[in-house]
């Protein structure tokens, strides 16, 4: 189950999180801003996904991960950089400059199936 900090109120997210843990499910808390990241720290047993896609404009910017990462560096669970990773160099930059080693890559893989440049890093 994924809990988007932009879409749910705090109490609803907490209830969904608690219920998922009771059912032995993993939870990904998705954040888009520093404020959402600070709020997500309460979900200690979750994975936290930093979504690089602006939900209002649908534009992606990997700098979102860099902007938010420092807030989450002490989170005990895995961090994920989500969306907008288009090249091998971007993936390596994210990996080398943050503690993040988990990435959600979709659109770029589908658009670049023949080139396989990003696959060589994975």
Descriptions of predicted regions:
Residues 21-25, 42-50, 74-76, 95-103:
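Glycine-enriched alpha-helix->loop->beta-strand junction motifs that scaffold or abut catalytic
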Residues 41-70:
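Glycine/Thr-rich beta-alpha phosphate-binding loop at enzyme active sites
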Residues 14-28, 64-77:
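Alpha-helix-loop-beta-strand connector modules within alpha/beta enzyme cores
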Residues 29-34, 78-89, 108:
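Glycine-rich beta-to-alpha transition loops that act as phosphate-gripper elements at the mouths
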Residues 1-7, 11:
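Single conserved hydrophobic/aromatic residue that forms the stacking wall/gate
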Residues 67-71, 111-122:
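C-terminal helical cap(s) of enzyme catalytic domains, especially alpha/beta-barrels
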Residues 8-9, 35-38, 54-60, 87, ...:
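Short, small-residue-enriched loops and turns at beta-alpha junctions
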Residues 34-43, 85-101:
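Catalytic cores of alpha/beta
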